[in-house]
């Protein structure tokens, strides 16, 4: 219980508890003894005077009528004791006093109300601005004929624009690094080759044989189940439709890059990044109304194709596990081997004798030997 609530509770107990049943002689002249404050129940709780603890005769101890069902108070050192490190970092990141990070290319409209092309200008302006990072504003800097155009206001706006541009550049660099790390990790997995080969072959077979799709549907269900509840799984259900031709091309490019024997891991990563950039530029131009996409639109398109490529490679890894991890043979113990009865053994022996002829007859049934051939030749 919070210390403030505990003090209110103690005051209410002292006002309506055993004090009303005391003899009236104390009100006519008998001086009441001032009770010392009750000891704190927990280390984080302070002691408040007027507590409902009555001193015992001859001792300085106090019986505070503790409730065993109540847990420790959530204040002081006890506050946040059950919060793990991840939640503590989330709580610290969500503080109102922290300066929020702004990505000019991907921020929401309520954060950055400007358009895509205006965001490009803000980014380039922030990169070109050179401000004094050690400048300290003085009261004279806030003086001016126009309150919105003073040296202090101009410096603050320039600093905000510079910070937003630097945070945007850092965020995009971190995004590219994260995507490349995940793709490199998938390329280093030994199951990626077999998984991508199976995925590409299945898509081509499903596309070239429309009459046999009923028999291929169980495999499609298995592949889509490995994709999970994602956009890739929804696209795989309709992989044969013309609107998903871009996904078939992406799977084919991943198959060609992964199964190329002359490329190492870094070259494969470069080829995949080149494919992602080319696809993002192509479809970003088609999506833009004027045919010239902004940097914000390009960043969103690259983010989309990077995520799709990662999902395809992860799906190939999950499918390829079936070929690279067979069930290991475990030598059984003698006690685990089922023992045959005499009747079962004699039945098996009879079946073996009836199904296979004796060893001597097998040689007699064979064709003419080399000696017979030589006699005939002579």
Swiss-Prot record:
The modification Phosphoserine is found at residue 362. Residues 363-378 have a biased composition (Acidic residues). One of its GO terms (cellular component) is host cell nucleus. Residues 1-73, 355-378 are annotated as: Disordered. Keywords: Host nucleus, Late protein, Phosphoprotein, Viral genome packaging, Viral release from host cell. One of its GO terms (biological process) is viral DNA genome packaging. Cleaved at different sites by the viral protease during virion maturation. Residues 16-35, 49-58 have a biased composition (Low complexity). Residues 1-178 are annotated as: Interaction with packaging protein 1. InterPro entries: ADV_PKG3, L1-like. All late proteins expressed from the major late promoter are produced by alternative splicing and alternative polyadenylation of the same gene giving rise to non-overlapping ORFs. A leader sequence is present in the N-terminus of all these mRNAs and is recognized by the viral shutoff protein to provide expression although conventional translation via ribosome scanning from the cap has been shut off in the host cell. Part of the genome packaging complex composed of packaging proteins 1, 2 and 3; this complex specifically binds to the packaging sequence on the left end of viral genomic DNA and performs packaging of the viral genome. Interacts with hexon-linking protein IIIa; this interaction is required to promote correct genome packaging. Belongs to the adenoviridae packaging protein 3 family. This is Packaging protein 3.
């Amino acid at each position: 219980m919070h210390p403030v609530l505990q003090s209110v509770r103690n005051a209410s107990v002292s006002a309506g508890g055993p004090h009303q049943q005391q003899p009236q002689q104390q009100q006519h002249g008998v001086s009441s003894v001032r009770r010392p404050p009750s000891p704190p129940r927990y280390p984080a709780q302070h002691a408040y005077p007027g507590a409902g603890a009555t001193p015992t005769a001859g001792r300085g101890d106090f019986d505070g009528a503790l409730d065993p069902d109540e847990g420790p108070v959530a204040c002081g050192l006890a506050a946040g004791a059950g919060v793990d490190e991840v939640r503590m970092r989330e709580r610290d990141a969500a503080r109102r006093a922290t300066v929020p990070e702004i990505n000019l290319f991907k921020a929401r409209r309520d954060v950055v109300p400007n358009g895509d092309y205006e965001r490009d200008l803000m980014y380039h302006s922030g990169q070109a601005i050179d401000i004094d990072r050690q400048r300290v504003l003085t009261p004279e800097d806030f003086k001016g004929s126009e309150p919105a155009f003073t040296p202090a206001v101009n410096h603050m706006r320039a600093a905000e624009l510079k910070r937003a541009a630097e945070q945007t550049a850092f965020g995009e660099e971190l995004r590219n690094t994260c995507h490349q790390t995940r793709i490199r990790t998938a390329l280093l997995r030994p199951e990626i080759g077999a998984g991508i080969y199976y995925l590409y072959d299945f898509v081509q077979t499903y596309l070239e044989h429309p009459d046999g799709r009923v028999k291929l549907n169980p495999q499609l269900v298995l592949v889509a189940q490995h994709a999970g509840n994602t956009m890739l799984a929804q696209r795989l259900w309709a992989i044969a439709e013309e609107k998903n031709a871009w996904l078939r091309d992406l799977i084919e490019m991943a198959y060609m890059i992964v199964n190329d024997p002359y490329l190492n891991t870094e070259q494969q990563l470069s080829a995949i990044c080149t494919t992602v950039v080319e696809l993002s530029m192509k479809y970003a131009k088609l999506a833009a109304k004027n045919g010239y996409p902004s940097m914000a639109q390009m960043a969103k398109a690259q983010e989309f194709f990077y995520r799709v490529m990662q999902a395809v490679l992860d799906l190939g890894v999950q499918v390829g596990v079936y070929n690279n991890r067979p069930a290991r043979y475990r030598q059984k113990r003698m006690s685990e081997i089922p023992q045959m009865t005499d009747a079962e053994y004699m039945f098996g022996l009879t079946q073996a004798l009836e199904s296979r002829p004796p060893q001597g007859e097998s040689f007699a049934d064979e064709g003419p030997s080399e000696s017979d051939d030589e006699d005939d030749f002579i």
